[in-house]
């Protein structure tokens, strides 16, 4: 019926008005054909079962499209009435008013099309975020309006584009429980390759959005196109293109120089992409991450120079650190033994005794001091404190420091890591099974997608810990260690296992620490609210130490070679207040770095060739921990990892705030007077080559 009405209206229009304006008639009929083809496509997809059982939704969608197809030819007649029925000035004012109304309608509808299919918290979105979405959409639609010569098709293209964005986010949410981030756009080919493995099904809300899009198309079919002819037409085309170019340049400058996070305080770290996207809206969240995507290119950078630096540092490593008999012996031993490697990143594990012993009531975390036979131990300096866990694991896996990527970035949510060399991928190439455990939501920090990109074969999240023992903020450390041990006992293949614990997570106001871990400390000048958090946190660390004792005892008794690397991801948030109260008047950089310090150790349950295993101490950045692990156990190393360890001789610790030179002094990256400035710039260049150039 809809098709018949459309054909009849087009034929009637052509017979009556062909001689008066062929291009306008063709334009109207093209709109009718386009909408009718969309209706036909919906019918075919529904018949094929692709659209699921939503009969009512399909019916409304087809009705909306058919209505648009039948009404499109009427646009010409109404436009003629408007042109002939009003004075020229009044007519232009009416056209401008109509254009503005329809443009706003298109912008608002597109906002709904982007958000409604997947955002069940749309009603709670702050007005500022909704307005930001509308402003950004308005700018985009204005540019499309000019680019398409003020015709219907530019606005239709924009509406179709944002409807596609909403659909894509709906399916990504349905399949992966994740938000689309800029790095996903960089890996569209990969996404398309795996899309065939999912079953597509549309919800009632989605059909409502599609119907709204169809009604928008109906409204847009009345949108006036360019009606000038001859020289006037050429002048109008030129003016529109010029305005588009000026606008595009202006938007580009705006995007580069005005950070949305600074204007409306959008979240740049995005630890919970789905939650943040729902609260802020898709468009402000995506734009914020995109603005934070770029890694500064080092001065005088070239691939040839970077490769030369990497090779030179790798050669220096082989001449010095890699030339010993112990090193060659460890390499031969690794090739023969293929030890399993377990990496534990313990949530918020740190030693608050570096600030104070609280009048002698607390001696500090037991590790690494409780492990005299460690291969290596000391402190690492994460780039985050109080939160931002994913950047710590990123630095460990990639050997790249956030110090050279830029502050206020969350690597997992803005970069495609599938082309980056990482520890999981390295061990996978060596024939290892690669497994990750995290007793929480796998979508946090985009981990589910990122772990797959980095080479993990399996990722076990909270759903795999049903019935597990809990402590404080989640599944206990011991429960995760039990899963690791089960894997080591049941699978004889060499394993690379990453265990990200959860129990110590803040906040520390739950008042749920049982005996014998409950603690009560005191400190003159410190408020009770902070002291109560300290009490709860210390109780968590005491329990973590006991669980770690238990785990290491089991590993010692295990009849297979295992290497354990353990580190804390960051300090708890309240240590900033301890630091400010107890250490006033320090230089700012050294003061800041005190809250960027957590314990680590590397240990094995077997004797490693060339290692005294007497608890040697060495502080380092998390970017050096992975390469140092490989070096100690004799595993094959990449040249970039050798380069990191070579430069570590001068740059003892590197994180987002700066670096500690081999003289024990902290320096900022822009301190050109530093005796280690040249080494820092070399590491910046090397890191851009092996990381930055691969993700942008």
Kindly label every feature range from the protein language model:
Residues 251-343:
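Membrane-interface segments at or immediately adjacent to transmembrane helices
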Residues 311-337, 343-346, 350-696:
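Solvent-exposed soluble domains appended to multi-pass membrane proteins
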Residues 128-135, 189-192, 207, 284-287, ...:
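Generic detector of well-ordered alpha-helical segments enriched in charged/polar residues
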